[in-house]
Structures are given as C-alpha cells and as structure tokens.
Swiss-Prot record:
Gene3D superfamilies: Cadherins, TCF3-CBD (Catenin binding domain). It comes from Mus musculus. The gene is Dsg1a. Keywords: Calcium, Cell adhesion, Cell junction, Cell membrane, Cleavage on pair of basic residues, Cytoplasm, Glycoprotein, Membrane, Metal-binding, Nucleus, Repeat, Signal, Transmembrane, Transmembrane helix. This is Desmoglein-1-alpha. Expressed in testis. Residues 510-525 have a biased composition (Polar residues). The chain crosses the membrane at residues 565-585. Residues 50-157, 158-269, 270-389, 386-493 form the Cadherin domain.
Length: 1057
C-alpha cells in the first residue's frame, strides 16, 4: 500500500472541506432589458431564515407567566413589508378561552392562566403571518405546547369493599382475589405508579394473606385456614402512588374474605352407647333419639349425617330415620321381635356425612361403631297357625262328617298346641267344611257334589279362625283342599244335602259365605257384606268374609194375591176422595152467611184475642182466704213426701202466679214463702191418700209457672209510681204546702206561719177513701191482701214456725179454712184545742188500746203564753193505723212550754202517717221528740214538716226505732224556718237493721233558714237476713224545695230519690 499517496489524498480532501465551509456562494442572475437591449447582472446571496422559535413546556397547576414568552414566530417577509401575526386553536378561540395571547407585531406568544394536564394534556396553536391586505405571507404553522404533569391525584379503588371467598384448608399461595385501583395522573409516570399494601387484618391472630405490591393480587400465606375457628376475615389495603414513596398520595379499601366450609370434621354420636327395652311383637315409631354432633356448617351436606347399621340388624327389624333440621336420628322398630327367638340384641351403628370427606382428612377417617343394646321383654302372645297354610286332599268317596284333617294353632309362649282357644270357620266356600271349636279337627259337612266341584273348579280355599277370648286376639290360618278323583255325585243323589238346602244353624255358626244354588229356577243374586270378628266375641253375622263375593239363594213363591176385599176397600177410598170437592162447595166457612165470598174478619177485642192472664182457659177467679195447710202425718209407704209440715209455719206473701189445682186424690204445690223471708221450693209429688185444694205460688225460685215474676214486680212498681204521681199531682188539699216566693201559689192575704192551714184542715175527703189506702200500700209493698186482717199483734212469729225444706211436697187437707178474728174499727173524727190567755192544762187524747183499723183524722193544738205541755197518747196495740195529719202550731206568736211529744204507735200494724206538721211560734222547748213506731209493720210516712223559728234551740230528734218494722215508707221530711239562728243535732232513720224488717222507703230531708246547720245520718238496712248496708246522708243548708217522692224497687229494699 502506498501510504504516501494516501496522505496526499487526505490532505486534499481536508482542504476542500475547509474551503466549502468558509467560502460564500454567490449566484448572479442576468436581467435582460428588452426595451433597450441591455443586460444587467444581479448577484444573490443565500442566507438562513428564522420563521419560528420553539415553544417552552408549561407546568400544570402553576403560574407559568414567568416563562413568557413561551414561543416567538417571525417571517422573513417582514423585511420588505409590514407583517401581522395571528394565532388560533384550543385555549385561544376555543374552550378554554384566553389561555394564550400573541403580540401581532413581534409574534411573541404568552400564557395567561393556570392549566390542568388532566383536562388538556397539550395545546396545538395554529400561527399565521398576514400582510396589510390580510393575505397569508407564509403557510400556516402548527405550534405544539405540552403541559407537564404533577402528582395532584391520589389512587382510586374501583370498589369500596372487595368481596372474596376461599375454602378452608386451602394450600398456600392460593389466589383469593385481585384489587383494582387507578390514578388520574400521567400514565407511565411515577405519579401514577401505585403500590399495594395490607395494613390491617381482622381477626389479627396471625397473618393469613399476602398481597402483590404491583398487581394487587391477594393470596393465602399458609394452609391453616379453619372455618370452625374463623369463618370470615376482614382486610384493609392501602394503595399509594409514586410507587409507594413517602411523597406519594394514597387511598384505602376493605376486603371481606369468607372462608367456605369443607367436610373436614368427622361426625360423632352424642352418646357412646345406648340401652333400650322393647316388648316383643310391638312396633315403635320412636324407640330412641340418637343425636349426631358435627362441627361443620349447619344445614349443609357437610353437616347432615347418615346413621347406618354396621351389624346386628340382619333381620331388618329396625330402621333409622334422620331429621335434616335437627340432625337427630330416630330408631324405629318395623318388624316384631320374638322373645323366644332373641332375648337381647346388640346393634352396631355408625355415622357419616352426606358429602364426601375433604382430602385433608380423608386419610384420618376411621369408622367408629356405637353399640345399641336392645332388651326384648316377654309378653303373652297368644296363638298362631304354624304353618299359616295347610293343604288337604278330598276325593269323591268321602262321605259327610269325614275327617279331613286338623289345623291347630300353636301357643307362641310354650311352642305347643294352644288349649285356651276356640276355632271357627272363616271363609268357607260352599259351606263345605266344619271345624271342631276345641280340637281344631276339620270334617266335611256334606258329601261333595258335582255342582260344588264345578263351582270350586277343583280346589277349595278357606280360612280357619283361632279366637282367644282371654287375650281378645284372633289369628287366621288358610286351608287348601284339592278335590281329586272322579265319580262326584249330583245334588239329588246326595240326599238333598246341597249347600243351598243345608242347615241354616250351621251356616250361622260357621260364618257361611260363598256361592250356593239349588234346582229352583227362581234365584236372587246379591252382595252380602260381612263384619270382622274381634277378640271378644265371634261374629254372629251368617254372611262374613269377602264382601264382594256373590251369594245366590233360592226365591220361593207364595200364594199372596189381591183379593175382592182389597179391591172393595180401594174403590171405597176413591169414592171418599171424590166427595171432598162436593163437601168444599157446600161448606160455608169461606163466605158470609148471606152467601157472600171472602172470609169474615176476626172482630177486635173478641174472645180470640190474647188474654192477659198466663194460663189457658177462662179468666181465673180470685180466691181469697184459701188457707195453706200441711198435713202433719203421712202414710208410711210414701217415700217421696215429707213427714210433716207445721200448718202455722206456711205464709204466703206474693200476688203473682196463684194457682189452685185439684188433683182428685192428691194435691200438688210448687212454692211456699215463710214469714221470715225464707222461700221453699217443692218438687211436684202426688199423695194418693188425701184430697183437697192447695194454693201454689210461682216465686223466683219456682219459675216453672206461666207468670213472670220480673214482669209482675215491674207492673206493681209502675202502679206504685202511678199512685204516687197521682197523689202528688192533685191540688194541694191533703198536704202542707210551703212557698218561698210571694205571689206564686200563696194566699193573697197576710202571710203568716198559720195563715193558710185552714184550707188544708178540711179532711172530709177521708170519709170516702176507706181501706183503699191500706190496700194500695199493701200492693206497693208486695204483701198479700187478706180479706180478714189478723188482729193478733204477734203474727207473724219471729222464729217459731218451721221451714219447709226444698223439693218436698206438703199436702193439704179438705177441711174448710178457719175463719180469722174480727176487730172493731175506731174513728176519731176531730179534736181541737184553742189556747187563750189563761193557763190551759194538758188535755190528752184518749188512746184506744186493742182496737183494729184505727184512723186518726186530725189533731190540732195551740197554746197560750203560759206554754202548757201537750201530750198525744200512743196507740200501743193498734193495728192498721192511719194517721193523716198531725199539726202542732201556736197562734200569733204563742209559745209551747214543756215537752211536746207525739205518742208512739208501738205494736201497730199497717200504720200510715201521711203528714206530721210542727209549726211553733216564737220558741220551742229545748227538746222536741217525734216518737216512732217500734213494733209496727207496713209503716208509711209520707211527710214530716217542721218549721221552727229563731227561738228553737236544742236538739231536734227524728230517729225512728223501727227495729221490727216491716215495709216502712218515708216519703218526705222537710225542715224549714225563717230567721233561725242555729239548729244542730242528728237526724236519723235507724233501727231497721235487718231482723224481720222489709220494704223500707226513704226520701230526702230538706232544711233551710238563716245560718241553719243540720247534720245527720240515715241508716237503712236490708231485710231477709241479708248483710247490712249503710247509706250516709248529710242534711245541710238547702232551699226547702218541694221534694217529689218516687218509689224505687231495689231488691227487697225500697227507697225514694
């Protein structure tokens, strides 16, 4: 190689390059002028152009104005002419507006606002250079401005809570789930690079999971996951950008991991062994409950168990039924056990799950047997046929009563033939066989005929019953007879011994059923149903066995026919039917007597209306005075009647339901009422030895009668109301009227305390009333009205009469009633005492003792200035006393001195006090006593009016001592006065405590006056041995309004409101 030449060539090349770089190329262009024909050369020099300056990058989230201008554009045309620069694009004339601006003269581009890379990663600016005419001097230029990213966005997980699941005992590094998180910063940048980390685990015993830092995959750390220990885990995972750097942003999310169950627990029984006892031949649906324990998830196939027999149940005597809800197995006995064959059984059972065992424990499973000891108890079993079927052969040569064989039941307890059973034929086709009831020997009833052979088709099948009456058990054995041979006789040759004409008694005894026929062409075919035979008695139905088998029995004709007598009766019946229309035409029940059509209307208020009495027949006549008498002696043969009833102890006090029954040889009563209030109900009995008439009372205890006691009581109460209203609505001619307002109902003259009494003292109307008041009072009180009042004050006795016990039959004799005693009537018409200026001695009113029906008309007393004492004597033994008015009043300011006493009516019966008026003048003595009847019965006090004045000082006592009173009525008590300073005391109605008292009626007590203060207590007691009831009533200062009394029925106590 010639190195010298090489050096020369290299040197020349280097010189050429240097010359090229440092030299300036010039191009001359010839300019030919065609006009003058001259040529001019111009030299052109090539220079480098500057049109654009590259734009600087912008950072997001910062103020980039310090970098302005971020770009500058320039055109070479600006040297020859003015150039205008303009820009357009996103951030300029497109949203977002106004981010970039340009200097149109210099071409500098500036940024004016903060940009966001997540909104606009970069900007493209279109630049133009325009001349003065707006034409483009250069081609449009694209200027790209990139926005630099900053870490301003944290990672975001796609789910708040991630759910995952994994089976327990899973291998290590098994994928559970994968987390997903994103970052809005620039991709493939450190700002968007996320790193995952588990920061918390619950339960926090030991870490069980790991996570991939880059991908977010969660995997198992080991294979120790156990659902029975922890069925669920909760993880908290954190994701941080900038690859988990300290300056990165982070976010957290939860992960819930469920541990799935696998069959990794071997089930076992609750008990290690079981002992049970069962009777032989018994079937049990619930012999024993076997509980299985499994720790796997409940109600899953891993938890459900199956108990099976390992050994001991070779005969399939037992079954085990599992309950899938409780995992409990029930041991059942499905086949009877025999004590003689097996006294004890050893069952070996095992348990497993429905699902297969998990591979982690399949090598550890070992079958464990649980022993079940079954003890069989011996019972008396009775008999059974062994074998259950026997076959015999019968040929045509066997005659009647030929022994076919024997079929004997075997006693299961002893294994020998039973001796305490009886045998009967069950299903016995053709009634062919007979069995001995004691020995079980089977014989032919009759010789087998050809007809029977043909119907049986050469083979007989029947049943034999073995009945044990002591055990009430029945067993059945089957008999099969093969009919072999030839030469079977016909029915005529067998001597009429076919089944159709056999002995009916045998047929009933042996339970015939089957098919039979005779030579009679008339047959009836039907189905006969049999009833089974229980263990206590044999079946007496002659047809038993299969109810669907057909029985053919002969139907024999008779000579019954329709004779002439029957034809005649039939014709006569048709003739009678033909007369019916004619009789209807002739009957005038459908029209008026004059021949008019239509039915006659029933007249109103005729005898066909409903009667007011409660018994059939005509209106009963009132029977007064019929005495109820009990016969003291009875015939010794009657056991249904009481021995005696004292005739003085029977007392009736009812108005409702009276009946008299004449039984023609015996009397009957259904109710009695004793004087002391005890009622006795007697069952209706008949005495055959005595005759007479008794009275029956339909009382509350005996409601068998036609009358309703509630209705009758309501009726009489309404009557009492009507009488009370009528009495109160009358003109004020029989009572004392008090008026508070002048001019309303008061006299027109001068008003004084006694100015209007004169009109009220006219008692002439009492002359015409008579005993009406007494009867009205008796009706209101519910007492019986006697035609002849008893003047004996001791009647009724308190406790001497015997009580008729319930459900007894007192007898009445036929003697006439005993006439009662008659008393005299004393009438005191009027006694008036006028006071003068002198001294007047007290004048007593004579007290008639021992009289009955006493009527005190009027007592009027006035006193002078010396104030003498006035004394009214009491009627000590008066009966049926009527006190209409008692008026005590001084004249023109006269005063009463001493004791003002109104006599008592002790011992009086049926006392009526209509008014008691005390109207003193200026003063009254210190004590004012209104005595009260203590031993009276049926007392009626309608009004008590007291008008004291200011001079009355002391105690005012109106305390009736009605300890033995009956049917007491107090309608009104009015206490009033003008100008009173004070009246203090106690007003009471007592002594009606409940021994012998009945029917009390009390009304209000009014008091008025200036400064009047009056307090009292009214005490009311129940009657008829009932408990005492107390009613408190305080009398204060109130307006003396006129109280209207209404009688109210409250059990046996009457009171007014």
């Amino acid at each position: 190689m010639d190195w010298h030449s090489f050096r020369i060539a290299a040197l020349l090349l280097t010189s050429l390059v240097v010359l090229e770089v440092n030299s300036e190329f010039q191009i001359q262009v010839r300019d030919h002028n065609a006009k003058n024909g001259t040529i001019k050369w111009h030299s052109i020099r090539r220079q480098k152009r500057e049109w654009i300056k590259f734009a600087a990058a912008c950072r997001e989230g910062e103020d980039n104005s310090k970098r302005n201008p971020i770009a500058k554009i320039h055109s070479d045309c600006a040297a020859n002419q003015p150039v205008t620069y303009r820009i357009s694009g996103v951030g300029i004339d497109q949203p977002p507006y106004g981010i970039f601006i340009i200097n149109q003269k210099t071409g500098e581009i500036n940024i004016t606002s903060i940009v966001d890379r997540e909104v606009t990663p970069f900007f493209i600016i279109y630049c133009r250079a325009l001349n003065a005419q707006g034409q483009d001097l250069e081609n449009p230029l694209e200027l790209r401005v990139r926005v630099m990213d900053i870490n301003d966005n944290p990672p975001v997980f796609s789910m708040t809570t991630f759910l995952g699941q994994i089976e327990e005992n899973s291998n290590a590094n098994t994928l559970v789930m994968k987390l997903n998180a994103t970052d809005a910063d620039e991709p493939n940048n450190l700002n968007s690079m996320i790193a995952f980390k588990i920061i918390r685990q619950e339960p926090s015993d030991s870490p069980m999971f790991i996570i991939n830092r880059k991908t977010g995959e969660i995997r198992t750390m080991n294979n120790f996951l156990d659902r029975e220990q922890y069925s669920q885990y909760s993880l908290v995972v954190r994701g941080s950008d900038r690859d988990g750097g300290a300056d990165g942003m982070s976010a957290e999310s939860e992960c819930s991991i469920t541990i799935l169950d696998v069959n990794d627990n071997i089930p076992y029984l609750e008990q290690s062994s079981y002992d049970i006892t069962i009777e032989e031949n018994a079937l049990h649906s619930q012999l024993v409950q076997i509980r299985v324990i499994d720790l796997d998830e409940e109600f899953s196939d891993n938890w459900k168990a199956i108990i099976f027999f390992i050994s001991g149940n070779e005969g399939n005597w037992f079954e085990i039924e599992m309950n899938e809800r409780t995992n409990v197995g029930t041991l059942k006995v499905v086949k009877p056990l025999d004590y003689e064959a097996m006294k004890n059984l050893q069952l070996s059972i095992g348990v497993r799950n429905v699902a297969e065992f998990h591979q982690s424990i399949i090598s550890q499973y070992r079958l464990t047997a649980t022993m079940v000891t079954v003890t069989v108890l011996n019972v008396i079993e009775g008999s059974v046929f062994r074998p259950g079927s026997k076959t015999f052969v019968v040929d045509s040569r066997m005659e009647a009563n030929h022994r076919v064989g024997e079929f004997v039941a075997t006693d299961l307890d002893t294994g020998r033939a039973s001796t305490n059973v009886r045998y009967e034929m069950g299903n016995n086709p053709e009634n062919l066989l007979v069995v001995d009831s004691r020995t079980g020997i089977i014989t032919l009833r009759n010789r087998v005929t050809m007809e029977q052979y043909q119907r049986l088709n050469g083979e007989y099948k029947g049943t034999v019953l073995s009945i044990d009456d002591s055990l009430q058990r029945t067993c059945t054995g089957t008999i099969v007879i093969e009919l072999s041979g030839t030469g079977w006789v016909t029915g005529s040759e067998s001597g009429g011994s076919s089944s159709g004409s056999g002995d009916d008694r045998d047929r009933v005894t042996n339970g015939y059923q089957g098919t039979s026929s005779t030579e009679n062409p008339q047959r009836v075919t039907g189905s006969w149903g049999g009833s089974g035979i229980d263990g206590t008695r044999p079946n007496t139905n002659p047809f038993q066995g299969d109810p669907d088998e057909t029985l053919e029995t002969p139907l024999y004709g008779d000579n019954v026919h329709f004779g002439p007598a029957g034809i005649g009766l039939l014709i006569m019946g048709f003739l009678v039917l033909g007369l019916v229309p004619f009789l209807l035409i002739c009957c005038d029940c459908g029209g008026a007597p004059g021949g008019g059509a239509g039915f006659e209307p029933v007249p109103e208020c005729s005898d066909g209306a409903i009667h007011t009495w409660a018994v059939e027949g005509p209106q009963p006549e009132p029977h007064e005075g019929i005495t109820t008498i009990c016969v003291p002696q009875m015939p010794p043969g009657n056991a249904n009647v009481i021995e005696y009833i004292d005739n003085s102890g029977v007392y009736t006090n009812e108005y409702c339901g009276r009946e008299m029954q004449d039984l023609g040889g015996g009397e009957r009563t259904t109710g009695f009422e004793l004087m002391d209030g005890v009622k006795t109900s007697a069952a209706p009995e008949i005495c055959q030895e005595y005759s007479g008439t008794l009275r029956r009372n339909s009382m509350r205890e005996c409601r068998d009668g036609g009358l309703n006691m509630n209705f009758m009581e309501s009726y009489f109460c309404q009557k009492a109301y009507a009488y009370a209203d009528e009495d109160e609505g009358r003109p004020s001619n029989d009572c004392l009227l008090i008026y508070d307002i002048e001019g309303v109902g008061s006299p027109a003259g001068s008003v004084g305390c006694c100015s209007f009494i004169g009109e009220d003292l006219d008692e002439s109307f009492l002359d015409t009333l008579g005993p009406k008041f007494k009867k009205l009072a008796d009706i209101s009180l519910g007492k019986e009205i006697d035609s002849y009042p008893d003047s004996d004050p001791s009647w009724p006795p308190q406790s001497t009469e015997p009580m008729c016990p319930q459900h007894t039959e007192p007898l009445g004799s036929g003697h006439p009633p005993i006439s009662p005693h008659f008393g005299t009537t004393t009438v005191i018409s009027e006694n008036a005492y006028h006071s003068g200026p002198g001294v007047q001695h007290p004048v007593p009113i004579p007290d008639p003792l021992g009289y009955g029906n006493v009527t005190v008309r009027e007592s009027y007393t006035t006193s002078g200035t010396l104030k003498p004492s006035v004394h009214f004597h009491d009627n000590q033994q008066a009966s049926n006393v009527v006190v209409t008015e008692r008026v005590v009043g001084p004249i023109s300011g006269a005063d009463l001195h001493g004791m003002l006493e109104i006599p008592d009516l002790r011992g009086g019966a049926n006392v009526i006090v209509t008014e008691r008026v005390i109207a003193p003048g200026s003063s009254l003595p210190t004590s004012l006593t209104i005595p009260n009847p203590q031993e009276t019965s049926n007392v009626v006090v309608t009004e008590r009016v007291i008008q004291p004045t200011s001079g009355m000082i002391g105690n005012l006592s109106m305390t009736p001592e009605l300890s033995s009173a009956h049917n007491v009525i107090v309608t009104e008590r009015v206490v009033s006065g003008a100008g009173m300073s004070e009246i203090a005391g106690t007003a009471g109605l007592g002594g009606v405590g409940g021994i012998g008292s009945s029917g009390l009626v009390s009304t209000t007590m009014g008091a008025s006056g200036t400064g009047l203060n009056m307090g009292g207590t009214a005490t009311i007691g129940h009657m008829r041995s009932s408990s005492d009831h107390h009613f408190s009533q305080t009398v204060g200062s109130a307006s003396p309004s006129m109280a209207r009394s209404r009688i109210t029925k409250y059990n046996t106590v009457q009171y007014s409101k």
